[in-house]
Amino acid sequence: MQWVEVEVLTTAEAVEAVAVILEDYGATGVVIEDSADLTRKWEDRYGEIYALDPANYPASGVRVRAYLPVVSWQEERAGEIQTRVKALAAVGLDPGAATVRYRLAREEEWAYGWQKYYHPVRVTKGLTIKPTWEEYTPSPGETVIEIDPGMAFGTGTHPTTILSLQALERVLKPGARVVDVGCGTGILALAAAKMGAGAVLALDLDPVAVAVARKNIARNGAADKVTVRNNDLLAGLEGPFDLVVANILAEVILKMIPDAGRVLPAGGTLIASGISRGKAGVVEDALLANGFAVEDTLTSGEWVTFIVRNLLPDPVEC
């Protein structure tokens, strides 16, 4: 079977929206090539993470790559995609160059080409994430999580995921009851379990994500601690939980904040990640308006993660 490889050149803040546009045209996932990764200081207190090949990255901006079935592709689709990407400016997102390129691709490129972008990554002081096909020998005391993203998800090396993992390492207490909202591959739920959580509930609206997360959790021997289920954010959950972590779009976090306050007792913690700098002020205002206090703010490039505490008293039962 032949595929059409579509590339969109955009900005970091518009990546998620561009991915959604490509999914509307039949993509089951995207590869994100951010030129900033080439200049980001990867050698930090965790040591060298991995070497990046400049040939795989654009000279500037962010390239979003997807594979679409050739049987459903028409040449005018490129223009349609470009129009929709440029229209993101109307909702406050910088679309950048918004150029669209496409070419025919072989079956093996679609099936395996994306794997070259994933390598073992030391994401916190004691945690490394590795794809299933890579060999890796951990150092003493190092925890390794093995992830098979398939073609629909990343391996947990996106800056927003790394910020979420670092936030978890800072605030998670042994035995905590944790909810991972929008779990994707299950990486945050797995990390919480490995860091000592007592019980973890991983939620996602996408049944594909639920299936992938369950496989990854079983592969890492965490099924006794982590439960995965299909759910729309925190709708219908009773709680209480000690910690809610959500690495999702700012707009979705805004929708979730009231329910987070409901399922978290006074003193409970929310980690809100996936927020672009341009949206951080709006999210912070909503958090404060709903009774949360900001305890810490983590940043990486264009991305912001809030660690907040619920200050509202627990509801009184009558």
Swiss-Prot record:
Keywords from the named record: Cytoplasm, Methyltransferase, S-adenosyl-L-methionine, Transferase
User: What compartments host this protein?
Assistant: Cytoplasm
Chief subcellular site? cytoplasm
> What EC identifiers does the entry list?
2.1.1.-
Cite a single GO MF annotation: protein-lysine N-methyltransferase activity
Q: Which reaction does it catalyse?
A: L-lysyl-[protein] + 3 S-adenosyl-L-methionine = N(6),N(6),N(6)-trimethyl-L-lysyl-[protein] + 3 S-adenosyl-L-homocysteine + 3 H(+)
Q: Which domain of life is it from?
A: Bacteria
Give the CC-aspect GO terms. Answer: cytoplasm
Which amino acid positions bind S-adenosyl-L-methionine, per UniProt?
161, 182, 204, 247
Question: Which terms does the UniProt entry file under GO BP?
Answer: methylation
**Top EC class for this record:** transferase
Q: Which residues form the signal peptide?
A: none
Family named by the database record: Belongs to the methyltransferase superfamily. PrmA family.
What's this chain's function? Methylates ribosomal protein L11.
Q: Which NCBIfam families match?
A: prmA
Q: What is this protein called?
A: Ribosomal protein L11 methyltransferase
- The species is Moorella thermoacetica (strain ATCC 39073 / JCM 9320)
